[in-house]
Amino acid sequence: MGPLPRGRVLYELGVRLISFDRPGYGGSDRMASRLVSDVAADVLAIANHLDIERFAVIGRSGGGPHALACAAMLPDRVTRAGVLGSIAPRGAEGLDWYAGMSESNVREFTTAAAAPESLIEELGLTAARIKADPMSHVATLGPEMPESDRRVVADGGIRMLLAKNFAEALRHSAAGWIDDALAFCAPWGFNLADIQVPVLLWHGEDDVFSPAAHARWMAGQIPTAELLVLPHTAHFGALEVVPDVLSWLIR
């Protein structure tokens, strides 16, 4: 889900937050040809190992589809799901999937769908540049960001957290990033309509990395969804509301 809330915030909420690297990121081994739905088995294994019977899930940005997968596929274990700034399935009927999306994300996803070998080469080169200077990658996002995102990322602490997050995710290779892009553009392996646990879909109205229309479309597919779209807020605004979403998850 990206940079985590401070320990003091979690303590005051009474939340035990367990995060993990998806396959190919950080210290996790790659799982080639994985689907979004494959995450449910990983989460189940972690919960069983820690003797956690019931739990909520939260995912931001690329973690959003994976949180939804857990909600759909682990109904006897998952209590609630919080999803912040997530894309919808690429085959979403009636949704103009690329409308309002940043040029860089359009290029990444169209390449993933049409020319996977080119994606591997392109993201591999980009990952090498990020590993060499992760802070500069944060700066390169600026021209595509709406003003509300620039305001969030102007905070030096946030910039440092994002840079550390990028560096850790790519410390071994770009495999996780590549496999995520491929999985997002393929069938996810579950149906949103099958979700029966409460889901909060949080989204910034001005998001250009995963447009708000995606959240609105998913809200129409998930029978238990609560949609919250904030005006004058974009993708990185999710970092500021994670404590609020955590509070919702433990109701």
Give residue ranges: language-model regions:
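Conserved alpha/beta-hydrolase "acid-adjacent" motif
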Residues: V208-H214
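The serine-hydrolase catalytic nucleophile loop
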Residues: M1-R8
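Conserved hydrolase catalytic core segment
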Residues: E53-W97
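Alpha/beta-hydrolase
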Residues: M101-F190
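Short beta-strand/loop motif that positions the catalytic acidic residue
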Residues: I195, L201-H203, D207
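Conserved acidic catalytic loop of the alpha/beta-hydrolase fold
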Residues: S37-A56, H66
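Catalytic active-site module of serine/aspartate enzymes centered on a nucleophile-bearing elbow/loop
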Residues: T224-R251
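Conserved alpha/beta-hydrolase
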Residues: L10-R30
